[in-house]
Amino acid sequence: MFSSYELREFFRRYKSEAVVKEHRFYSVLIPLVEREGKMHVLLEKRAAHISQPGEICFPGGRIDAGEPPQAAALRECNEEIGIPTGEIKVLAQGDTLYGQADFTIYSFIAEISEESYGRIKIERDEVEELYLIPLSYFVENEPEFYRERYETNIREFPYDKVGIPPDYEWRRGTMRIPIYEYDGIVIWGMTAQFLNRMSS
């Protein structure tokens, strides 16, 4: 058995962590580019052969082991559109999104100069096209919102072992999905959530 002293010493050195098994962490950059005196949001269209093909998103991706979220966002932006990390001015950490499918997405709002934007080199394996959309559009226009109700239905669970009935009422929730449309470009889901929060 542990003594009181041993327990105190153990917990003095104990480092708390979020209890998130099999959890994935991502980071995105929300790039702002000033052109003709107006600030624009830089968005990507995902390549047709990768996951979520054709969706509109920010530069970003999975965080490598031991990598700070901001460094991951800058690295992904460099890999996807060729802008050196030294030419990206991070203005602030944006919102953090916690998804129902075991993932967390960090966001960082940054400014990219018009000169750097002019030297962009698209990585075609990941990005099909780039868009510049006036920031004022998101400030002045609310997205459409669709609500999707979700619930847990666990059939293969040891109900007898934990002492609850098979018709146990698991937690339910409602997912609110925003959708923007600008000049034929449809932006929805997590990208739209970040934009709606930032512009509001």
Where are these regions (language model features)?
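Phosphate/pyrophosphate-binding betaalpha-module
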Residues: 123-125
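N-terminal leader/linker segments that precede catalytic domains of diphosphate-processing enzymes
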Residues: 1-57, 62-79, 83-119, 136, ...
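Flexible glycine-rich active-site/ligand-binding loops centered on an Asp-His dyad
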Residues: 127-132
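Short aromatic-enriched loop/helix-cap "lid" or pocket-rim segments at secondary-structure transitions
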Residues: 143-145
